[in-house]
Amino acid sequence: MGTYDSEVIVGLKDGVLDPEAETIKRSLERLGYDLQFIKSKKLFEIKLDAESKEDAEKKVNEMTKRLLANPTIHEYKIEIL
């Protein structure tokens, strides 16, 4: 068994309203920045024990589906470091 570091990035799917990003976009434009697009995402750093890298990825994927992301509105990317 080894210890694995992972990162999970969770963001809203295309077409889902992102009020946080819209507020930030308007504020940055008021500060003089010309933006075409901005999207907010969350980064989760997870350290866990697992039998293998594949087992770690399986566990992190399960955690993400069960709690970190709502598959109806979120997309996510998992990386085992």
List each model region and its residues.
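Long, contiguous binding/interaction regions
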Residues: 1-81
